[in-house]
Amino acid sequence: MKVANDYEKRDNNSYYVDHGSEGTNITRDNDGFFEETAAEIAEPYRAADRSNDQDNDRSGGNVNEGRGIGYIALALSIISLFVLPVLLGAAGIIVGYIARRRGAQGLGAWAMGIGVVSLVLGIFIIPFF
């Protein structure tokens, strides 16, 4: 039994592996190259495939997903012009941002804009009257 070197070269493409009791003859037809590669080598990853996966996750029915949240945000912002401007204005900004993230771009932007106006009026201008 060999301890330091398990592979004993016999000829150009033939190896003898000694595992103790019996040996195994390994023949390789690789034109003189003796490198071993692992079976875990995967094909290269392309980042462009990932955008296609994300498009498939969202179907056409979810386009109006944030519209209800957008209307709620707009209502909060408009009500904040008359009642509790700091509290409802901040709520309108936060809910408007959530609506924008969910696809209601216009409603979310209007809710955030009106909420900012109401917040500025409530903090800086109304206390002086």
UniProtKB/Swiss-Prot annotation:
Predominant location category: membrane
Record's bilayer topology term: Multi-pass membrane protein
Positions with biased composition (Basic and acidic residues): 46-58
Transmembrane segments: 78-98, 109-129
InterPro entries: YqfX-like
Annotated localization: Cell membrane
Keywords: Cell membrane, Membrane, Transmembrane, Transmembrane helix
GO cellular component terms listed in the entry, alphabetical order: plasma membrane
Region (Disordered), start-end ranges: 44-63
UniProt KW Membrane keyword: yes
Keyword Cell membrane assigned: yes
Name by which UniProt lists this protein: Uncharacterized protein YqfX
Organism name: Bacillus subtilis (strain 168)
Origin organism lineage: Bacteria, Bacillati, Bacillota, Bacilli, Bacillales
Primary gene name: yqfX
